[in-house]
């Protein structure tokens, strides 16, 4: 935890940087639904930088058909994000608290650092200003990462966590 300008920031311990290696880096224009990455397993960090005033959906822990997934709805114009684990993996989550929501400054670019393993997802927004965590139990083959947006440039980096 760190305090910057009267704001509390939360971020993983520095030792995490020593256990990861870059697998793939992309900068591309997105229009519609695309497969961003498909890691071999669910043990990774995904860093994604989204421009200001954009809306879209990020699907994590997804199968190829997108019938199982963890969904991240984002709107950088309104400054809103929602994480929904209702359709993730083994015995889809039918709980009352399957969604998490957060607000941040509107009309700004949105950076997400997403840490995924076989039982949890942690999303750090804008370098740890906001954090959402959730349990998730995907099937082993549910490693697809999809992004759905309209005409936007997106930068991503995918790291394997050893």
Region roles according to the model:
Residues 2-162:
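Beta-rich accessory regions
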């Amino acid at each position: 935890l760190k305090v910057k300008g009267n704001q509390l920031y939360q971020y993983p311990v520095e030792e995490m940087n020593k256990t990861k290696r870059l697998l793939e880096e992309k900068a591309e224009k997105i229009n519609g639904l695309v497969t961003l990455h498909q890691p071999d397993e669910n043990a990774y960090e995904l860093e994604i930088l989204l421009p200001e005033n954009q809306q879209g959906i990020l699907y994590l822990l997804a199968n190829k058909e997108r019938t199982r997934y963890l969904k991240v709805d984002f709107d950088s114009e309104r400054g809103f994000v929602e994480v929904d684990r209702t359709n993730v993996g083994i015995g889809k989550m039918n709980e009352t608290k399957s969604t998490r929501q957060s607000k941040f400054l509107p009309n700004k670019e949105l950076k997400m650092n997403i840490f995924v393993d076989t039982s949890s997802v942690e999303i750090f927004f804008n370098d740890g200003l906001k954090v959402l965590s959730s349990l998730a139990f995907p099937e082993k083959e549910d490693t697809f990462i999809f992004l759905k947006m309209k005409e936007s440039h997106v930068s991503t980096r995918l790291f394997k966590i050893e």
